[in-house]
């Protein structure tokens, strides 16, 4: 079994040197991701595609490879194929007949062939020969060239025949790290998660800057979002997660700033702090999830005033998107459930926000801040490799709270997303297993029997640890992490 990785069309349009560079980087990215699934993963770059080989003795890797390839930027689509050699057109037909005879029963069909190399036949001749044979010697309902029930896809590359078993749509975009790095201001909500994803997809290593306004619980939730985005879409490269303690800034805003200017000034302070972080990291651009008119600070007038506080490029990929479209994308990329459980902190500090801020007035209000305020919060910022989020949870959750065995009376809570739990349900003899997705656990845990002990489970142990830490912050001492 092999996968044929087809490049995103915009890559194919590049000049030869750029195209080669992008293809090499995509090959490396694929190898980096798949080696985390299996160390023996083999990836081979060709001019217009990349081949991924699955060992014949490891059919269990097919689905895992397919899932990972579908989430790597730079891929248009992936073809899951069975590979063989052929000698004649009739040989191609005979192999196709064996592969598709049962599937064609009672269905209309057509045959589509792509060919590369030197042959004494063309693609249309193969389509006619194979299609005619299948129509005559199978129980198919007949040939239909437009809107058939089934299309038999074949690819011929010199003397190799690829019988296409499945087509998997890719993420599109450019390979990771073909574009410059960006620093995404992430709050954990719908918008910042989607805007971060847009730049990952476009080929930028996306680092995360979080302004903590809500304490440890807020930070835990946002780290889950950032870790999910990195693990699913950007795992081929290292990125940083920066947490800036912004409660001193909020406190001074509440004490010293005119109520109507609070929202705009808070955003300006965030941009100033993010600019300093970006400059330290050698990053040229900031990314935000702002959409025009969505809230009071996001009118064109206010966005203009916000941008005046920094010379750093501020990118807003969602600027003209509707909220529902943003939510739909968040659902597709798996951040919707996180966002639902994280409150919006920025909006609570101003009761009557202005929609037409005046720069001079804003600057006059900002003069009331302590001179060293930003210096202090930047000095206290925590910068970690995003992979360390899992390690951090290990250090905060003691050894007695992480177990690999289940005691009598303990209950397992499977915190995986519903689709993951349904795909491979956790079944243990003599043990009660409750399926409560991570995004519902915070609200449903209080309804559980307080006399019982609960063990949280997920595939990699990251989400279960984050949820355990969150519940412990809430005062629950009857929760542990289950790592079999």
UniProtKB/Swiss-Prot annotation:
It comes from Shewanella pealeana (strain ATCC 700345 / ANG-SQ1). One of its GO terms (biological process) is thiamine biosynthetic process. The gene is thiI. ATP binds at residues 185-186, 267, 289, 298. Its main location: cytoplasm. The lineage of its organism: Bacteria, Pseudomonadati, Pseudomonadota, Gammaproteobacteria, Alteromonadales. Catalyzes the ATP-dependent transfer of a sulfur to tRNA to produce 4-thiouridine in position 8 of tRNAs, which functions as a near-UV photosensor. Also catalyzes the transfer of sulfur to the sulfur carrier protein ThiS, forming ThiS-thiocarboxylate. This is a step in the synthesis of thiazole, in the thiamine biosynthesis pathway. The sulfur is donated as persulfide by IscS. It is found in: Cytoplasm. This is tRNA sulfurtransferase. The keyword Nucleotide-binding applies. Keywords: ATP-binding, Cytoplasm, Disulfide bond, Nucleotide-binding, Redox-active center, RNA-binding, Thiamine biosynthesis, Transferase, tRNA-binding. GO terms for molecular function: ATP binding; CCA tRNA nucleotidyltransferase activity; tRNA binding; tRNA-uracil-4 sulfurtransferase activity. SUPFAM superfamilies: Adenine nucleotide alpha hydrolases-like (SSF52402), Rhodanese/Cell cycle control phosphatase (SSF52821), THUMP domain-like (SSF143437). Its EC number is 2.8.1.4. It catalyses: [ThiI sulfur-carrier protein]-S-sulfanyl-L-cysteine + a uridine in tRNA + 2 reduced [2Fe-2S]-[ferredoxin] + ATP + H(+) = [ThiI sulfur-carrier protein]-L-cysteine + a 4-thiouridine in tRNA + 2 oxidized [2Fe-2S]-[ferredoxin] + AMP + diphosphate; [ThiS sulfur-carrier protein]-C-terminal Gly-Gly-AMP + S-sulfanyl-L-cysteinyl-[cysteine desulfurase] + AH2 = [ThiS sulfur-carrier protein]-C-terminal-Gly-aminoethanethioate + L-cysteinyl-[cysteine desulfurase] + A + AMP + 2 H(+). The active site is at 458 (cysteine persulfide intermediate). Pathway: Cofactor biosynthesis; thiamine diphosphate biosynthesis. GO terms for cellular component: cytosol. Residues 406-484 form the Rhodanese domain. Residues 63-167 form the THUMP domain. Pfam families: Rhodanese (PF00581), ThiI (PF02568), ThiI_fer (PF22025), THUMP (PF02926). Belongs to the ThiI family. It comes from the Bacteria.
């Amino acid at each position: 079994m092999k996968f044929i990785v087809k490049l995103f069309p915009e890559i194919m349009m590049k000049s030869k040197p750029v195209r080669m560079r992008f293809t090499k980087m995509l090959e490396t990215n694929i190898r980096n991701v798949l080696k985390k699934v299996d160390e023996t993963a083999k990836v081979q770059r060709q001019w217009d595609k990349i081949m991924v080989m699955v060992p014949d003795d490891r059919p269990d890797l097919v689905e895992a490879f397919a899932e990972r390839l579908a989430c790597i930027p730079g891929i248009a689509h992936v073809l899951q194929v069975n590979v063989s050699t052929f000698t004649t057109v009739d040989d191609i037909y005979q192999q196709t007949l064996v592969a598709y005879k049962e599937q064609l029963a009672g269905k209309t069909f057509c045959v589509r062939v792509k060919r590369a190399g030197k042959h004494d036949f063309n693609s249309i001749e193969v389509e006619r020969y194979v299609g005619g044979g299948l129509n005559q010697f199978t129980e198919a309902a007949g040939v239909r060239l437009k809107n058939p029930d089934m299309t038999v896809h074949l690819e011929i590359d010199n003397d190799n025949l690829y019988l296409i078993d499945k087509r998997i749509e890719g993420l599109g975009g450019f390979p990771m790290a073909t574009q410059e790095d960006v620093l995404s201001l992430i709050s954990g909500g719908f918008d910042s998660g989607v805007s971060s994803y847009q730049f990952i997809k476009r080929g930028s290593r996306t680092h995360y800057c979080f302004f903590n306004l809500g304490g440890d619980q807020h930070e835990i939730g946002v780290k889950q979002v950032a870790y999910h985005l990195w693990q699913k879409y950007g795992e081929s490269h290292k990125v940083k997660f920066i947490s800036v303690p912004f409660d001193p800034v909020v406190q001074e805003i509440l004490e010293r700033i005119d109520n109507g200017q609070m929202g705009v000034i808070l955003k300006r302070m965030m941009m100033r702090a993010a600019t300093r972080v970006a400059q330290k990291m050698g990053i040229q651009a900031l990314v935000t999830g702002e959409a025009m008119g969505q809230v009071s600070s996001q009118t064109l007038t206010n966005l203009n005033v916000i941008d005046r506080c920094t010379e750093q490029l501020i990118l807003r990929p969602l600027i003209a998107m509707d909220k529902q479209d943003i939510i739909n994308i968040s659902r597709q990329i798996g951040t919707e459930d996180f966002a639902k459980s994280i409150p919006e902190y920025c909006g609570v500090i101003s009761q009557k926000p202005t929609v037409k801020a005046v720069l001079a007035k804003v600057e006059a209000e900002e003069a009331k801040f302590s001179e060293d305020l930003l210096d202090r919060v930047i000095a206290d910022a925590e910068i970690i490799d995003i992979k360390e989020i899992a390690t951090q949870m290990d250090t905060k959750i003691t050894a007695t709270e992480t177990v690999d065995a289940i005691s009598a009376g303990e209950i397992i809570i499977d915190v995986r997303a519903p689709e993951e739990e349904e795909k491979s349900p956790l079944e243990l003899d003599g043990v009660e297993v409750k399926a409560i997705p991570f995004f519902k656990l915070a609200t449903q845990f209080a309804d559980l029997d307080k006399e019982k002990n609960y063990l949280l489970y997920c595939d990699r142990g990251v989400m279960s640890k984050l949820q355990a830490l969150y519940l412990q912050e809430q005062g629950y001492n009857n929760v542990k992490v289950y790592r079999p």
